[in-house]
A protein has these predicted regions:
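Juxtamembrane/start-of-transmembrane alpha-helix segments at the extracytoplasmic/lumenal side
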Residues: 275-290
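Asp-box/WD-like beta-propeller blade repeats and closely related beta-sheet repeat scaffolds
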Residues: 14-53
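Structural WD40 beta-propeller signal
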Residues: 52-56, 109-111, 181-183, 251-253
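Conserved positions at the start
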Residues: 46-48, 56, 100-105, 175, ...
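C-terminal membrane-anchoring or membrane-association module
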Residues: 296-312
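Beta-propeller domain segments
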Residues: 65-236, 243, 261, 265-272
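Short, exposed beta-strand-loop hairpins at the edges of beta-sheets
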Residues: 12-13, 256-260
């Protein structure tokens, strides 16, 4: 088991480092703790980061810019310092991607094996990226789709190539966790990518194209791959009312799990056929399918006076 976090002197205190530990799991407790990666950290923000295992069991993690400005942030000067990158830590390898401002989400497509991430912009340009090997996400020069002028401003980190996001929000939503469904329990959504956000408490669903390297939109407002400030997002909003979502995970049981930081709760999304009629005695709340008033299947449940709705 791998554990990646920013270790500090105390809760909210000075960071000591972004650290990766491995443990053995015997089914009851974690044992044999080993520090395998100790990354530089002096700031309390933009440290990272998600961790993911690909189809070959390689392990990756993402690190934010940590307030640094150097070559890995697309400046012409400054020594690389393991910030604004996706690292492969097992087996060790040079930077998989650079130019990342701040990310809370990594996911591997279970069909294609391709890596995807979410990235938070400053006050614009939140995005979803298809992260190919030697990817340059563009920060601090580019956030959101690039203009020709911005492309010319990239100094160019040898061997790394910039690609536009697969989707961008003009207004910040703080996208976080993302996950694919590969389960017969959600057959309708096998070709979908689910993304959560922290600012609005929304769960988004993006329909993948046949090549699984981009999205299909029916709305003319979203077909330019940008959600402008006044564009309707009804097509992609799958669920609402989750507070600050920090992670979206497809579990080994084939169900979808939503982690809400603000609610202190893990929500499990289940199809009606496996639904339960009451909440289990834990922080996990199970959503039950019910027929909507207009004949559309939806999930509706209430927790802490906030209504949650999911379109199915």
């Amino acid at each position: 088991m791998y554990l990646y976090f920013t270790e500090s002197t105390h809760d909210g205190g000075k960071p000591l480092g972004k650290r990766v530990y491995t443990y053995d799991w015997n089914g009851t407790v974690l044992t044999n703790k080993k520090l395998i990666k100790d990354l530089w950290a002096t700031q309390t923000y933009h440290n990272g980061g998600a961790m993911v295992t690909d189809l070959n069991d390689s392990v990756y993690l993402v690190v934010g810019d940590a307030g640094r400005y150097g070559k890995l942030q697309n400046y012409p000067d400054g020594e690389p310092d393991d910030t604004s990158v996706i690292l492969r830590i097992a087996p060790p390898d040079p930077y998989y991607a650079i130019g990342i401002r701040n990310s809370f989400g990594l996911a591997i497509d279970p069909v294609s094996g391709k890596m995807w991430d979410t990235e938070n912009g400053p006050d614009f340009g939140d995005q979803i990226n298809l992260v190919t090997p030697n990817f340059n996400s563009g920060w601090d020069v580019i956030m959101g789709p690039a203009t020709k002028d911005k492309l010319h401003q990239l100094p160019g980190f040898p061997g790394y190539t910039y690609h536009d996001p697969k989707f961008t929000w003009e207004k910040t939503i703080a996208p976080t966790g993302l996950s694919f469904i590969d389960s017969d329990k959600f057959e309708k959504y096998r070709n979908s990518l689910f993304v959560g956000d922290c600012n609005s408490g929304n769960l988004y669903r993006f329909q993948l194209n046949d090549a699984r390297d981009g999205f299909i939109f029916h709305s003319s407002q979203l077909s330019d791959l940008v959600a402008d400030k006044n564009d309707s997002q009804d097509e992609i909003i799958f669920g609402t009312g989750f507070g600050c979502i920090t992670d979206v995970v497809a579990g080994p049981d084939g169900l979808l799990y939503i982690v809400s930081l603000s609610d202190g709760t893990i929500y499990r999304i289940v199809p009606k056929s496996t639904g339960e009629t009451s909440d289990p005695p834990s922080i996990e709340y199970i959503a039950i399918l019910a027929a909507g008033a207009v004949g559309i299947w939806s999930l509706i449940f209430i927790m802490k006076k906030r209504q949650k709705k999911i379109k199915v």
